[in-house]
């Protein structure tokens, strides 16, 4: 069976067992700030397992795209060198949300694996593990399925503490957890390795192919396990692993899917030996990179984009090791489409953008390598020993993306080594900084534990009443808060909008006869709306009723910006093309920010046309309508859906703007607050456009009175410019143009005069040349000269004094500029960089450079004259 046939067979089998086939979620986790990438089939169902979300099915089956690279799950360095490490893989899974449990889960797995109708694996090739106290699972395997006792292995707490086991799964330190049962396949005694639980278990003979996790308990902070009222099932089987089993190969890289990619890489790079690890790297990384880009990740220097950039560069580096020249990696997309495009049509649909992104990143990496080589060459010329410092290796790696293996290769060519210990020390420091400063946010789920949902009554009202369901202070639930206490309060119903879809949460206040609570923000925790704020008077208690009052002016301004954001999105797609996809947004009361996918900056003319389109819809003053539809009806209506977002079976469809071909100007799914008519927006004005990451642009805009303020400020600035230029309003551009041309001409004259002055000064300085250590040497101080003019003077002197050592110090205000050059015949013993480093160190400044030319600077201080006077003696010794 091919990998594609195995994937389809798995999904069809579980459909036949009453499961709903659910599409793979995006590799960018939706509404889960704790994850870098989707790395398991259960990620998209996390809220279902936590009881925070209910769907119209209780059984599901998926083939989930997963990436493990960066963060907690980082397989990157092993990829290509082992049989089963990948950055991208597919996880086949079946799930039960409080429906069936161990008996059905294990029976399904055994039936699918061994039945001749499905995979037909030999039963004598299969072994299973169970948690050592899970007698229920053991008995199901032994007494009901009929597996011999010597094929069932009990695994205890093999990770150092209670419930820390390969066969016990936990979502976190507290919360859902439970035992699991894994199924292993025996590849045969010709391959080294032992059964699970033996010293040889890390070998490749017995390979785990399926894991059945039983969410049976809730673990509390005291470590006690309490049975869940509705236990659930989460299973996972790696498609690549089961394909290797069915295709009778031991390495995942030998399955049909990878072999097509590896053979294609050989053709693209012109390589004959298909067994090289670098080919496996290119094949694996092509999958993760193409799928990540398709799911909206773009190469950048932070977060997910940084991980993608590292993977691309690692692939390109390995391609270069194989002999690839120019851009080649983007060509791997078409072979990937050949084998995975039917299952994942986003690859074909987004082919042009994926290829363009890869080409751009390859070209950028080529420039980066060139810059890194220059830096490395500079460091090597100043190296005093045989070891390149770890700090230098890390700087090349971290700042320039320079692969450490390339640094090591260059070092070996010069009979040098790299300080691997020092490099690892720097890497660990970076990891520590990342853990401290770059942790993903923790949401309120870890604090707020409320059954049921808050009823939102705020679409058409800014005030209402509600009962206090829960109060939290300092992370703990309390019954009462008093004046000065900061707290989180949950009501049974509220007019306050909770932050979602880019729109900020409402602010305002709660009040009753006993106290006032200032609401500073509103967020969601599952179905609960959490009001964050401070008690400003009196006290509030649980079960009390309060008047909930939203700040109406802030709400109205936010609504204007939210509706304008929808119009902006539609206008962008009209002007730039339908490839434009939202990548992020902020809807506040004073500004709107919209991030979108686009490879090029938006031109001034395009921005004007976008503004014109949006304001035309504002002037039209059409109604903004909402309706609740099932998801299929919403799609049929043409509603925009954000890729990677999770939508329920019933969605809120927002339509606004003029009707063209029976479709509104803008139709999107949205749960936010909006104006009633487009005219309520008043005026729309773009205030900035720029890039925030490769392939991602950002537009910031304002509406209503804020937009009027921007226009009036621009008018005032023009009026001020006219008064300075003594120009009439219709003469502004003409007068500014004339002033620019005049200024440019004056700058040229100044440059010419400075050059004449430098030539004149250079001729005078030649009389100060002296012989130091057998070298013609000029050391002098020049008054009232900036760094650029000092460089010009140096160049003039050097043109007249080629075979010499030149050291110039320029003084301007409280600054010292330094420049030194050494004729090439002297650089074996004396380096310009060393001269500048010596002077800068003595003067408390910085500087450095190449052996023949270096520059630096320092603050002017009382040591200056002494340091310059002592320089000849220093040169005598070097």
UniProtKB/Swiss-Prot annotation:
Q: What Pfam families does this protein's entry cite?
A: DHHA1, tRNA-synt_2c, tRNA_SAD
Q: Where in the cell is it found?
A: Cytoplasm
Q: Which GO terms describe its biological process?
A: alanyl-tRNA aminoacylation; negative regulation of DNA-templated transcription
What cofactor is this protein dependent on? Answer: Zn(2+)
Enzyme class name? ligase
- Which regions form coiled coils? none
Q: What is its main location?
A: cytoplasm
Paste the cofactor note.
Binds 1 zinc ion per subunit.
The keyword Flavoprotein is assigned to this record: no
Q: Which GO terms describe its molecular function?
A: alanine-tRNA ligase activity; aminoacyl-tRNA deacylase activity; ATP binding; tRNA binding; zinc ion binding
Q: What is its EC number?
A: 6.1.1.7
> Which reaction equations make up its catalytic activity?
tRNA(Ala) + L-alanine + ATP = L-alanyl-tRNA(Ala) + AMP + diphosphate
Q: InterPro entries per the record? A: aa-tRNA-synth_II/BPL/LPL, Ala-tRNA-lgiase_IIc, Ala-tRNA-ligase_IIc_anticod-bd, Ala-tRNA-synth_IIc_core, Ala-tRNA-synth_IIc_N, Ala-tRNA_ligase, Ala_tRNA_ligase_euk/bac, DHHA1_dom
Residue sites binding Zn(2+) per the record:
562, 566, 670, 674
Protein family per UniProt: Belongs to the class-II aminoacyl-tRNA synthetase family.
Q: What does this protein do?
A: Catalyzes the attachment of alanine to tRNA(Ala) in a two-step reaction: alanine is first activated by ATP to form Ala-AMP and then transferred to the acceptor end of tRNA(Ala). Also edits incorrectly charged Ser-tRNA(Ala) and Gly-tRNA(Ala) via its editing domain.
Q: What protein name applies here?
A: Alanine--tRNA ligase
What organism does the UniProt record list as the source?
Acinetobacter baylyi (strain ATCC 33305 / BD413 / ADP1)
- Gene that specifies this protein: alaS
């Amino acid at each position: 069976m091919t990998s594609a046939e195995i994937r389809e067979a798995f999904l069809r089998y579980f459909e036949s067992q009453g499961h709903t086939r659910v599409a793979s979620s995006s590799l960018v986790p939706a509404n889960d700030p704790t994850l870098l990438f989707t790395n398991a089939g259960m990620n998209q169902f996390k809220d279902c397992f936590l009881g925070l979300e209910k769907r119209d099915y209780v059984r599901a089956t998926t083939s989930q795209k997963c990436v493990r690279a960066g963060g907690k799950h980082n397989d990157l360095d092993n990829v290509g060198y082992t049989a089963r490490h990948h950055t991208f893989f597919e996880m086949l899974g079946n799930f039960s949300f409080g429906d069936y449990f161990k008996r059905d889960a294990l029976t399904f797995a055994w039936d699918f694996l061994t039945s001749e109708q499905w995979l037909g694996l030999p039963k004598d090739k299969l072994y299973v593990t169970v948690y050592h106290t899970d007698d229920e699972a053991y008995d199901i395997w032994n007494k009901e399925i009929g597996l011999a006792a010597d094929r069932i292995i009990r695994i205890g707490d093999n990770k150092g503490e209670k419930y820390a086991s390969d066969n016990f799964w936990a979502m976190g330190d507290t919360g859902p957890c439970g035992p699991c049962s894994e199924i292993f396949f025996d590849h045969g005694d010709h391959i080294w390795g032992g059964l699970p639980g033996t010293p040889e278990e890390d070998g490749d003979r017995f390979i785990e192919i399926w894991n059945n996790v039983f969410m049976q308990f809730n673990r509390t902070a005291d470590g006690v396990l309490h049975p869940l009222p509705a236990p659930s099932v989460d299973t996972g089987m790696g498609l690549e692993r089961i394909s290797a089993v069915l295709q009778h190969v031991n390495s995942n890289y030998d399955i049909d899917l990878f072999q097509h990619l590896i053979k294609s890489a050989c053709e693209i790079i012109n390589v004959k030996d298909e067994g090289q690890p670098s080919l496996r790297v290119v094949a694996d990384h092509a999958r993760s990179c193409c799928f990540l880009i398709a799911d909206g990740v773009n190469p950048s220097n932070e977060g997910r984009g940084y991980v993608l950039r590292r993977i691309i560069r690692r692939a390109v580096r390995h391609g270069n090791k194989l002999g690839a020249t120019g851009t080649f990696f983007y060509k791997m997309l078409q072979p990937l489409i050949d084998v995975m495009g039917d299952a994942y049509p986003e690859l074909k649909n987004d082919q042009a953008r994926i290829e363009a992104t890869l080409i751009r990143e390859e070209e950028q990496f080529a420039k980066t390598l060139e810059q890194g080589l220059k830096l490395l060459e500079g460091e090597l010329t100043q190296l005093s020993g045989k070891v390149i410092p770890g700090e230098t290796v890390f700087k090349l790696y971290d700042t320039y993306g320079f692969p450490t293996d390339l640094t090591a290769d260059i070092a070996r060519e010069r009979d040098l080594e790299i300080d691997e210990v020092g490099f690892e020390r720097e890497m660990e420091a970076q990891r520590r900084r990342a853990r401290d400063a770059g942790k993903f946010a923790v949401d309120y789920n870890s604090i707020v534990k409320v059954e049921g949902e808050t009823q939102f009554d705020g679409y058409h009202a800014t005030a209402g009443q509600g009962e206090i369901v829960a109060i939290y202070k300092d992370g703990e639930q309390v019954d009462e808060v008093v004046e000065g206490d900061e707290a989180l309060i949950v009501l049974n119903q509220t007019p306050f909008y909770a932050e979602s879809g880019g729109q900020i949460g409402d602010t305002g206040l709660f009040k009753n006869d006993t106290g006032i609570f200032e609401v500073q923000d509103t967020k969601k925790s599952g179905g609960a709306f959490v009001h964050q704020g401070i008690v400003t008077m009196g006290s509030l208690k649980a079960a009390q009723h309060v008047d909930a009052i939203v700040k109406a002016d802030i709400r109205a301004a936010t609504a204007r910006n939210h509706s304008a954001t929808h119009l902006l999105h539609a206008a962008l797609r009209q002007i730039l093309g339908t490839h434009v996809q939202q990548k992020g947004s902020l809807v506040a009361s004073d500004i709107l920010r919209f991030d979108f996918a686009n490879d090029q900056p938006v031109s001034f003319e395009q921005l004007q046309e976008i503004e014109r389109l949006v304001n035309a819809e504002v002037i039209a003053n059409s109604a903004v309508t909402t309706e609740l539809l099932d998801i299929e009806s919403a799609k049929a209506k043409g509603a925009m859906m954000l890729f990677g977002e999770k939508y329920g079976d019933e969605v809120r469809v927002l339509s606004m703007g003029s009707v063209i071909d029976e479709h509104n100007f803008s139709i999107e799914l949205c749960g936010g607050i909006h104006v009633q008519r487009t005219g309520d927006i008043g005026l729309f004005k773009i205030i900035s456009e720029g890039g925030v990451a490769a392939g991602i642009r950002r537009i910031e805009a304002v509406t209503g009175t804020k937009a009027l303020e921007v226009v009036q400020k621009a008018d005032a600035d023009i009026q001020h410019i006219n008064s300075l230029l003594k120009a009439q309003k219709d003469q502004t551009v003409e007068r500014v143009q004339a002033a620019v041309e005049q200024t440019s001409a004056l700058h040229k004259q100044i440059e010419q005069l400075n050059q004449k002055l430098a030539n004149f000064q250079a001729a005078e300085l030649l009389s100060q040349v002296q012989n130091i250590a057998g070298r013609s040497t000029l050391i002098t101080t020049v008054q009232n000269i900036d760094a650029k003019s000092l460089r010009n003077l140096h160049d003039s002197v050097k043109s007249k004094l080629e075979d010499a050592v030149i050291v110039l110090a320029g003084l301007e205000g409280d600054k010292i500029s330094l420049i030194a050059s050494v004729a090439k015949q002297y650089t074996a013993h004396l380096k310009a960089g060393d001269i500048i480093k010596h002077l800068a160190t003595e003067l408390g400044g910085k500087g450095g450079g190449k052996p023949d030319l270096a520059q630096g600077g320092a603050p002017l201080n009382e040591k200056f004259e002494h340091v310059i006077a002592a320089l000849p003696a220093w040169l005598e010794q070097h």
